[in-house]
């Protein structure tokens, strides 16, 4: 897989739970953790060659986050919108995935999305759906965070409180769904006990069952294989879809994939 390497700028810890704090920040540049070309490994576009642009910084703190370098300890470099547009154009790939961290908290993200789409690219936004900056995309890949995603309150009291307060703004999510050309809703599932909560979120979002994907929490093939026997039939029983994490099967759990 092709990747773009840049010097790393680690954010101060006091900024790590918010929109990245940087005196140089402007709407013409974004803090980018990494960019790479790979195959989409999750959801309805699985197997599609895509340019991935991972923004750094997140307003949530899922305990199982598989990209802590973009959330718990965000790092990256400032890149201009023009730099990112040129990177996509040079790749020759027409599907772009904006991911994170949480891409929708990044200053300049709406302008980047608009310009990518104006250039003829298909844009997927991978988001937890906690904020709505007014972006329009081709595919909204919405990942609502369930109660079990909250970090341990004993170890991280401030972050646990922040996460719990922010993780599930249903009205904001519905606005994002209304603005997108298409939507898939992906739940990271750690236990069968979470099914009633998933059902309730789906009901509140008023989303079709076949647009809902249940994906195992795990960063190894062994974890994925252990979850599938109970998670796949659970998804089917509700008319949902089972979602594997093919990037882990193809490449392992590593950056740039």
Curated annotation (Swiss-Prot):
S-adenosyl-L-methionine binds at residues 101, 143-145. Transmembrane segments: none annotated. Signal peptide: none annotated. [4Fe-4S] cluster binds at residues 58, 62, 65. Residues 1-25 are annotated as: Disordered. Belongs to the radical SAM superfamily. 7-carboxy-7-deazaguanine synthase family. This is 7-carboxy-7-deazaguanine synthase. The lineage of its organism: Bacteria, Pseudomonadati, Planctomycetota, Planctomycetia, Pirellulales. The gene is queE.
